[in-house]
Regions:
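P-loop NTPase catalytic nucleotide-binding module
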Residues: 1-14, 33, 101-187
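P-loop NTPase switch module centered on the Walker A-proximal segment
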Residues: 1-99, 105, 143-152
């Protein structure tokens, strides 16, 4: 079984712990979907975290995904606890950078992005809270490309040719494979 260490990072209140709870619930690791606002999130174990509704200490949870064992690290998002978050970076295989669709890219989001690039951690961006009024998918994608990286692409479209071309353009080896096979590898 392959072991993967994956960190969840974001600015405060973007929904890191909520996303982590969802992953644990959908994988069958926890029986009840906890909520930060209900003070019953599985990963917010300290009373101070539950009282304030924020993550203060990085937490670990483990779940299985196919033949992979995922070690999930939920990190603090508040800038005051950045040192706690930064300590986790040296052990990550992958990261998920959570961005609130309602708030867009924040200053701390840019700092996290730069750190992830510095540590050369492959990163997925997860846009949360897109159901809130005033969110605009296209404006947010433009902001991601301008403030983070031009290579940000949407994976929600499925495996159509346009999406595969966008994915292929992010890496020369992937592009070579795409040009030869008209698809990309699943890994």
């Amino acid at each position: 079984m392959e072991n993967i260490v994956m960190g969840i990072l974001a600015h405060v209140d973007a929904g890191k712990t909520t996303l982590s709870e969802g992953m644990l619930y959908l994988s069958g690791t926890v029986r009840k979907l906890g909520r930060v606002d209900h003070k019953d999130a599985f990963l917010d174990t300290y009373s101070l975290e539950r009282d304030r509704g924020i993550t203060i200490f990085s937490k670990q949870a483990v779940f299985s995904l196919g033949n992979r064992r995922i070690n999930l690290l939920d990190t603090p998002g508040h800038v005051d606890f950045s040192a706690e978050m930064e300590r986790t970076l040296q052990v990550l295989d992958y990261a998920v950078l959570v961005i609130s669709g309602a708030d867009g890219v924040q200053g701390h989001t840019e700092t996290l992005w730069k750190l992830l690039k510095l540590y050369e951690i492959p990163t997925f961006i997860f846009i949360n809270k897109m159901d809130q009024p005033g969110t605009d998918r296209e404006s947010l994608l433009t902001e991601l490309k301008e403030r983070l990286d031009e290579g940000c692409i949407v994976f929600g479209k499925g495996k159509n040719v346009e999406s595969l071309e966008e994915i292929a353009m992010t890496d020369e080896a992937v592009l070579d494979y795409f040009m030869e096979h008209e698809t990309v590898r699943n890994e």
